[in-house]
UniProtKB/Swiss-Prot annotation:
Record's protein name: Putative cell wall protein
Natural source organism: Arabidopsis thaliana (Mouse-ear cress)
Composition bias, Gly residues: 85-98
Expression induction: By gibberellins.
Reported tissue expression: Inflorescence.
Amino acid sequence: MASSLITSAVIVVVLSLVLGSVEQVSGLRHVPKSPKTTDVKHPDFLVTIEPKPTILIPGVGRFLLPPKCKKPFYPYNPVTGAPLTGGGIPSYNGGQGAGPHTQLPGGDDTLVPNPGFEAPTPTIGAGTGSNGQVPPVPLP
């Protein structure tokens, strides 16, 4: 009786090993050696959502990076809305003849803040003396 019990136990163990190895073999799948990068999958729920560039800050979380500009940035004059060609603030000639002036209408022309009065900028041009110096301000 013992021999039939041992043979049936051996048959069960051998059968378990055979079925276990068959299950392992059937569970394997073919993995390509070089994956195709053109076959990118995106979810199609309501709209096509493409992954956006993000940055991970440890301890804070993940943030979206701003999108790259598709068009180049052209600065414009906020007063007239016209594009600036020089890239800076346009000079004002005061409605007089040729030659650029550094004084803007309504702007503060002083080099040092002086709440009592405005003094012209000490440059060669309008408001300067004969040798390029600013004339003294007369006191009352």
